[in-house]
């Protein structure tokens, strides 16, 4: 089972449904959210662990390919709610 290494160093089980929920919050429909979550899951399934930043990078890359507005919504949400500067952190 893949573990996610959170920004604070804690580890938790990789749960694809969390990706789906986050993408839904960005405005994408369920089918798109599930498709992106499945792609990301396939990217990491052979690994022992993955960092939260890596996951975010993968998710945003896929989201941007599909819809620039949903990508922007994710960034705005991270800035407003989570107080993160996601685009800068991922450079």
How would you name each of these model-derived features?
Residues 1-91:
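Long, C-terminal-biased catalytic regions of enzyme "large/alpha" subunits
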